[in-house]
Amino acid sequence: MITLAASLVTGFLVTFLSTPYAEKYLMASGIFAVDQQKKDKPRLASSGGMTVLFGFLSSITVYMALTSIPGGSTVNLTILLAALSSVIIISLIGLLDDIHVDLEAVMTEHLSIGDDEIDIELHRQTNIESLPHQKLLNRLSGNFSQGKDPNEDEMLRNGLGQIPKMLFVLPAALPLIAVGAGSWSMTLPIIDFTINWGIIYPLVLLPLGLLFVSNVVNMLAGTNGLSGGMSLMASTALGIFGYLNGQIEAAVIAWSLSAALAAFMYFNFYPASILPGDSLTYLCGAAIFSSMVVGNMEKFGVFIFTPYILEFFLKLRSGFSARSWGILQQDGTLDSHHDKIYSLTHVFMRRNMTERQITVSLITIESLICVTGLILFTVIL
């Protein structure tokens, strides 16, 4: 237990100490996004999931190192390394999505703000103000007042298309398939009926499950601290359930994510100083799914994922085109972009809630579902 605690503290500290530096680095690198639900629409560093990834990796690798010492606990290092591989692959896909720039939009924006051309030739010693993206940022932020209000643009970064993202996610399942993670059969509670999936499980169900979980975590976002907070609740519950059932590897994966997320929430909760980006939501989805599969906790995982499943069907109604974030009103509440409810956030927007209240409400609901699931699956079933 001391080994596990030491690894979790390491993951927390790595994320907590690296995030302030990441904020400056990401902004200087042009990896930022507009916080649309604030009055002044500030530009904040995005892709904060990278610091969570570093904390997650540090936690698990420290745990593996400490358990490898003679006299340490016996764990399946192969399973942990496979889970790490899957999480890293998906996190990189999220990072690619975060940094993908619409070059046509950039050129259009450039042409609309002046006739001066930007020199893209870089030298060994270059002042940050001379970098192309920084010149563009300076122009958009008011140093050159021509053109449209910079706060009216949503972002020049439009991300990868849905099809490429889906295809890129699938290879992340290969490490888990290679080590035979998960169970090829499932017993339904109450009726005690067992379904034997056979080869369908590793070749079909496992990749599709990873694809679904990573994407639905990405769907239920839009307010400061929402994606990180809900993932924190889910991963903590998974860790507890895995530990109680003797699935130590699953608990290590889940709690390592929890430790890193707890540190990140200090910076991402309302009002955020850094945004998570797809690198975080994809990372959380992959880590949570890996914990489910490694610990054979799919039934419990489906239960605590109830809000995400509801979000999926709500977004399906809109053809996956609806926005979860809202429009800031004069009184500080948020109003939906849509007349119908296409997201769980829209339910609370209709109740005239602020961004902070929406985030806290959804995290509270997820925590209650997790507690109910722990009682249901450990005591009753």
Go through each PLM region and give its residues.
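Membrane-proximal soluble regions of multi-pass membrane proteins
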Residues: 307-358
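"…together with the soluble PPM/PP2C metallo-phosphatase catalytic core" -> "…together
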Residues: 1-315, 319, 366-369, 373-381
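Glycine-rich, charge-dense phosphate/pyrophosphate-binding loop(s)
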Residues: 361
